[in-house]
């Protein structure tokens, strides 16, 4: 008769533990992301990882925690620096083994609206995205289990995990969830352009012409001037969750999306990056080949390379595309760049909620 009593006791203990975790989880304060209505509500927050104040705060600590790397010297912020709109100013970043990454570090602004991450879209969801740099041998180079063991031995992290998840047990899954929560709060929505949309800023003549060029399709037949940027970078968030070959090479040196899908039609296609804070995130493109906005505009204006998978919006059979040339004047290019500078959000790069908590 002893065994049933023991089993019953174990079951009751487990139920009590689960109940305590549930109550503690409910005690964590829900956090509603703050963003303008014109951003739209097509956001992505998994049901099993809701935003909470405690989870986001834990994620902030983890984002700047060097113990998550094999050499205890590299954190997520190593490649994603707040003052650079969470990029690092390099064409390719250096990991724990001194090896350069294969592609340019992307900005982390406004990830709340994204489902497929990295230039090639390999990761679905921020939780899956976070695991890649943490465990990649050429980036942070450490198994999640090892990272969890290191954090479990610290003085402060067990308590932080307990507040966020109900118990002090640290696991790789919880590390990923906390990081994802923090990164979903990195919202940039107070640029000069946002102030213009809200009616609190009056653009200069150059900025206004830049806005018009950005959102207008050119048509040589009707003498309509435009840069047609909005096909890929339309809407107030300045990106669409699509993959395009933007004419960098006639024969792509990097297969891009095709490395994931295995489809030849995806060769040379990469995820459309946000233009938010674009003036702060040089160098540009997946390989960091352009160091200035002037070089980027020149590329789209007159250096598009034809290839079988070139985006339909850049092909030379489109109205206004004069043999893959937009034909913007020097003055128009300056005005377009003036608009791109309007997308800089000074409050985003100085917001203490996103800053290094160890300083």
PLM regions and their residue ranges:
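Extracellular low-complexity, Gly/Ser/Thr-rich intrinsically disordered linkers
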Residues: 289-347
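Mobile amphipathic helical/loop "lid" adjacent to a hydrophobic cofactor/ligand pocket
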Residues: 126, 137-142
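Short glycine/threonine-rich turn/loop motifs
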Residues: 24-132, 194-299, 304-312, 352-359
């Amino acid at each position: 008769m002893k065994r049933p009593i023991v089993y019953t006791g174990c079951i009751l203990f487990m139920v009590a533990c689960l109940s305590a975790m549930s109550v503690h989880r409910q005690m964590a304060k829900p956090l509603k992301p703050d963003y303008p209505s014109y951003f739209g509500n097509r956001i992505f927050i998994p049901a099993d990882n809701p935003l909470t104040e405690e989870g986001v705060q834990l994620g902030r600590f983890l984002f700047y925690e060097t113990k998550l790397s094999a050499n205890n010297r590299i954190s997520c912020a190593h490649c994603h620096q707040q003052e650079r709109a969470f990029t690092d100013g390099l064409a390719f970043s250096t990991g724990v083994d001194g090896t350069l990454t294969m592609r340019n570090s992307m900005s982390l602004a406004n990830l709340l609206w994204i489902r497929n991450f990295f230039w090639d879209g390999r990761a679905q969801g921020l939780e899956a995205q976070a695991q890649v740099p943490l465990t990649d041998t050429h980036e942070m180079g450490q198994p999640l289990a090892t990272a969890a063991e290191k954090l479990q031995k610290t003085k402060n992290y067990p308590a932080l995990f307990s507040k966020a998840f109900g118990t002090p047990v640290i696991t790789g899954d919880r590390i990923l969830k906390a990081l994802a929560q923090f990164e979903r709060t990195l919202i940039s929505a107070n640029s000069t352009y946002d102030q213009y949309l809200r009616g609190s800023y009056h653009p200069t003549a150059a900025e206004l012409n830049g806005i018009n060029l950005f959102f207008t399709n050119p048509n040589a037949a009707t003498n309509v001037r435009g840069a047609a940027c909005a096909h890929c970078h339309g809407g107030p968030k300045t990106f669409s969750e699509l993959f395009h070959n933007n004419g960098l090479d006639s024969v792509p040196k990097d297969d891009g999306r095709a490395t994931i899908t295995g489809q030849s039609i995806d060769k040379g296609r990469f995820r459309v990056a946000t233009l938010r804070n674009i003036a702060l995130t040089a160098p540009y493109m997946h390989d960091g080949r352009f160091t200035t906005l002037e070089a980027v505009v020149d590329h789209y204006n007159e250096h598009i390379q034809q290839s079988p998978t070139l985006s339909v919006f850049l092909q030379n059979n489109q109205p206004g595309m004069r043999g893959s040339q937009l034909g913007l004047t020097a003055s128009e290019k300056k005005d377009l760049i003036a608009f791109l500078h309007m997308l800089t959000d000074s409050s985003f790069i100085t917001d203490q909620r996103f800053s290094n908590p160890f300083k």
